[in-house]
Amino acid sequence: MEMSQYANERIPKPDRLAHWQIGQLAHRAFPPRLVIAAPQGRSGKTTVAVGLCAVLAARGLIVQPFKKGPDYIDPSWLTEAARRSCRNLDPYLMGKDVVVAAFARGSRDADIAIIEGAMGLYDGFDLEGTDSTAALARWLDAPILLVVNAARVTRSIAALVQGNQRFEPGTRIAGVILNNVARERHQRMLTQAIEKYCDLPVVGVLPRDDSLTIPDRHLGLIPRVENETHVPAIAAARDAVLAHFDLERILEIAGEQGGRGAGERRRAGDQLPISNLESPISKIGVIRDRAFSFYYPENLEALQGAGAELIFVDSLRDAHLPTIDALYIGGGFPEVFWRELQANVSLRVEIRAAIENGLPVYAECGGLMYLARSITWGDQRGEMVGALPCDVVMTGKPQGHGYVELEVVGENPLFARGAKLRGHEFHNSRIDLTGFANVSGLGIAYGVTRGRGLDGQRDGIVYKNVLASYAHLHALATPEWASAFVARAKAG
């Protein structure tokens, strides 16, 4: 396979599964599938996964993308490329049974599933690599395409690949994709070394090209929803895959484990009713726009399954709240859009008034920041909703980054005292709680046993019917969340 010019543009770990129960479907319900992994982060996994999704979707295949871990941003790019919502598979948050169930359910009508790994192939929660991408691939009996950064290396690439092949028995690396390849001679030397010493095919090559870089900023990649350059970025990845990948061999590798036909898998998926309710029992507003885009599809589906009608609100454009029984404000980048948020005075005033009148509100990270009095970034300060008596200060480095473990220690609208929750946080801000203890009616929902939260010990500000925290929760890891929120909305 020789390099060529780009082609022209063409077309707590839960012990129950709740309404996601799939019985004994397991691997027999899986479609052809691939895990896109790498020896380390920033090797090109997202570019490869995005390019593959775009090419296969353009061929007319139903492509179901997945992302390992709790990330929101990579899935936004995969969603756009595949033309189908990406779903997260998080071994640490969900556990094996729920991950397998979620994969079977999410891919039940797909022709192929593309699973993008996280960090290095064997990186996990601890020294043993618990919950790694390799473990996920084994759970799903999925072949792995290893993306390797080939900059400034030739024969030594074989040692790197071979080490990944042998490190954990049962991990099935089925092919290699080379990234940052300088020229045809470089590619030839790399390919010969891998084929001779690793007995693996090189099924794709990405040339050294800045156009194949997806834009990023202070918290990683920029979400596709707020990035006007997403079309050329996805097109560049697609064209590189089209020009430099052996797509037929890749499809062969994906299908080597077999799997049921789409019709049979669809019937299997029919065993997974979202809801037995004939009509919604409450209306929940969801602020979803360029400023707030961090929502797991399963969270929205779980709310619907519990009986909610979802009504979407744009915090940047909508002047008024619709008629709703509760409000859900997910994460995002309010610090980037503080001017627009500040300018929408009428909506901010209505949200604050609704909270004072008892509207149930659940907010995560960016949503917490929006409910505060203000956001300060350097010498800039933006007025926010002001429902919570605290201020947000942006810093130059992560304040909380990674998994969190929480224990419910205080009264709150959703969770019983003593409950233990697992979630994720990733924020460059801190909350100034000066004077917090002197304000009546405020409480703290969570004690932090792992992670940062508000101050390393606490998370989850409670005020009236508001629960706002830095922690992001996933409905498959916290199955009681959706039903509790809908019940609170119904109760008013």
Q: Which residues fall in each region the model found?
A:
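Intrinsic disorder/low-complexity segments
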Residues: 1-29, 257-281, 438
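Beta-strand->loop->alpha-helix junctions that form or flank phosphate-binding loops
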Residues: 67-68, 202-210, 309-316
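Internal gly/pro-rich beta-alpha loop/helix module
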Residues: 154-258
